[in-house]
Amino acid sequence: MRMDTLDSQAAEAAQEEEIQRKLEELVTLAKDQGFITYEEINEILPPSFDTPEQIDQVLIFLAGMDVQVLNQADVERQKERKKEAKELEGLAKRSEGTPDDPVRMYLKEMGTVPLLTREEEVEISKRIEKAQVQIERIILRFRYSTKEAVSIAQYLINGKERFDKIVSEKEVEDKTHFLNLLPKLISLLKEEDAYLEERLLALKDPALSKPDQARLNDELEKCRIRTQAYLRCFHCRHNVTEDFGEVVFKAYDSFLQLEQQINDLKARAERNKFAAAKLAAARRKLHKREVAAGRTLEEFKKDVRMLQRWMDKSQEAKKEMVESNLRLVISIAKKYTNRGLSFLDLIQEGNMGLMKAVEKFEYRRGYKFSTYATWWIRQAVTRAIADQARTIRIPVHMIETINKVLRGAKKLMMETGKEPTPEELGEELGFTPDRVREIYKIAQHPISLQAEVGDGGESSFGDFLEDTAVESPAEATGYSMLKDKMKEVLKTLTDRERFVLIHRFGLLDGRPKTLEEVGSAFNVTRERIRQIEAKALRKMRHPIRSKQLRAFLDLLEEEKIGSGKIKSYKN
């Protein structure tokens, strides 16, 4: 028995020593990598540690040693964050400019914002949803919303507004059925609005008893509840409802101005009868506006304060969601560099897509926000490149065709080892060779005339282009000599013959004249001018005169004067 006891004590001591050694191994590993996972704890601890109580003791021991215990998913998330941080640091180093360069500052500041977990995304989305519900509830209290909704519904019925821009399609399964119900819904809203106005006017009666006032207020509240229920049946998008809110804020400004006017008149009404009359008129005007709004001045103020508070909460939650996903924009935008837009412009466009994704995200579908936002960010970036990257804008569908051809060319080049011909590429993609050539021509980028040519940059591309609108020195010299020689030859003719040739062929101003126009100058018939012209031309063909001009025939043929380009023979 004594030997058994000793053996048992020795085994326990060995087991405790092994446990202590394993715990030290856990602490060493945790300090090396900054944390330890549950999986690593299970691997290192001996098999005898299999009860929850023993595991809890180990976790308490590690907590006392300031060791952080994480799930494998948390570890992967940390690795991902470190990888993104390194990428951001690399991008910041590669961005050109001084330390206060906007790209560098943006990347540095963005790297300090932590990423969101799935649970945090859901929590923020719920805050946004709650704020939107409260915003809609407050806005629909006002009669302005009824008038705006009826107006928009009429536009939908008449086809003057796009259905998907006004109505939330996820809440309306049958578009045709919904449009057929709109006239009935409009009729119900108008009835309730008329009933509401009637009760509001009745409440303004100063002789109204308290029981009647309580009864009218009760009827008024029930009418408002029914009106809000009908308005929700329109299933308007959140942005449309917020447009109704703009009408509320605009009316609120006019309410405040009128209230200020009434307060100013109150101070003068006691000693000025004209001010008293204006005060009464201002109060009547205020009563009319209260009826038009469906709210008293005090109710209006209270509702607007609440509306602004919920709008601020909504914007704060959206801002938090956007700022936590700016790294996603960077990771997508960097794949589209060197395509015609600067990196900063790509980031800006991607951020706009991210904000749109925040507006449209539905957390109940179960996927992560980053999965949903990636499509919107990529869509915004690619659309911006298509619209802004080229000096001459190419339609988006043509951009897609160009990319298809370029991918096909790259694929064939990798397979064959040579640049594919238009015929080979057309056969691969199902295009005609002429269509492929046309696409290649469209895909060419314009070149700036100021683009530097050569290593020194002393010449620009425009220096090597011929300016066809300017005469060459040889051409100008040839025409100058021709004009001088023409003057000498024409001097051998009579004054009348010289005048007729000059004006008939436009040698003076480049504009030939008709026989009638020349004849009117001499007050003779067109036939007589024709005879003078024929005689003058015969003289010009005489060898003595023609040989002086024959040397210029080559110049005239080269410049194609006969095609309509006529030079005057005088400066």
Curated annotation (Swiss-Prot):
Chief site of localization: cytoplasm
Known function: Sigma factors are initiation factors that promote the attachment of RNA polymerase to specific initiation sites and are then released. This sigma factor is the primary sigma factor during exponential growth.
HAMAP family registered for this protein in UniProt: Sigma70_RpoD_SigA
Protein family according to the UniProt entry: Belongs to the sigma-70 factor family. RpoD/SigA subfamily.
GO biological process: one example: DNA-templated transcription initiation
Keyword Transcription: yes
NCBIfam families tied to this protein: PRK05901.1-4, RpoD_Cterm, sigma70-ECF
Species this protein is from: Chlamydia trachomatis serovar D (strain ATCC VR-885 / DSM 19411 / UW-3/Cx)
Pfam families per record: Sigma70_r1_1, Sigma70_r1_2, Sigma70_r2, Sigma70_r3, Sigma70_r4
Superkingdom to which the source organism belongs: Bacteria
Keywords, sorted A to Z: Cytoplasm, DNA-binding, Sigma factor, Transcription, Transcription regulation
Start and end residues of each stretch annotated as Sigma-70 factor domain-2: 321-391
Name assigned to this protein: RNA polymerase sigma factor SigA
Hydrolase is among the record's keywords: no
Annotated region described as Sigma-70 factor domain-3, given as residue ranges: 400-476
Organism ancestry: Bacteria, Pseudomonadati, Chlamydiota, Chlamydiia, Chlamydiales
GO molecular function: DNA binding; sigma factor activity
Positions of the UniProt region annotated as Sigma-70 factor domain-4: 489-542
Localization terms from the record: Cytoplasm
Subunit structure: Interacts transiently with the RNA polymerase catalytic core.
Stretches assigned to coiled coil: none
Motif Interaction with polymerase core subunit RpoC boundaries: 345-348
DNA-binding region in chain numbering: 515-534
GO cellular component: cytoplasm
